[in-house]
Amino acid sequence: QAALPFLARGAHGSIVNVASIYGVLGPDWSLYEGTAMGNPAAYAASKGGLIQFSRWLATTVGPSLRVNAVSPGGVARGQPDAFRQRYEARTPLRRMASEEDFKGVVAFLASDASSYVTGQNILVDGGWSSW
C-alpha cells in the first residue's frame, strides 16, 4: 500500500504475480504418502492471499496498470520417485512441469496481447485442476 502513490503517478504496464495451484486447490495428501514431503498450510495461505491481492491491486491501480497472477502446477525438482509418479498419473498431460512451461503465459500477460486482461489468475497445471 505504501507503493500505491508511486504506482498511481502514471505508470503503465503489467504486473504478473506467481502464485500456485495450492492457492486455489487443497492438497491431495495421497501424493505425499511414504515421502518426507509435506504441504504447509502457510504456503497455501500465502499463495491464496497473493491471488486475492492480485485482484485487489488490479481494481486499485487500473486502468494504467494491469495485475494478474499465474498459478503453476507441480514443477519437477528432484522429488521422490513415488511422489512424481503419483503426481504424473493424476495430471492429464502425464508429467510435471518445468520452469519453461510458464514462460508463454507470463509473456502473454506482460505483453499488450493481454491488454484487456486484469485481475485474473491463470492456472498452468497440465490439466491438474480439470478433474
Language model regions located:
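Short-chain dehydrogenase/reductase
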Residues: 1, 54-55, 103-106, 110
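Catalytic loop of short-chain dehydrogenase/reductase
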Residues: 8-12, 16-62, 74-75
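Short, small/polar-rich loop/turn modules that mediate ligand/substrate recognition or access, typified
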Residues: 12, 62-66, 117-119
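Hydrophobic structural elements of the Rossmann-like NAD(P)H-binding subdomain
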Residues: 16, 67-70, 119, 124
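Short C-terminal tail/terminal secondary-structure segment
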Residues: 27, 34-36, 107, 118-131
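A glycine/serine/threonine-rich, flexible loop-to-helix segment
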Residues: 27-36, 69-91, 101, 131
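A conserved structural motif in NAD(P)-dependent oxidoreductases
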Residues: 91-102, 113
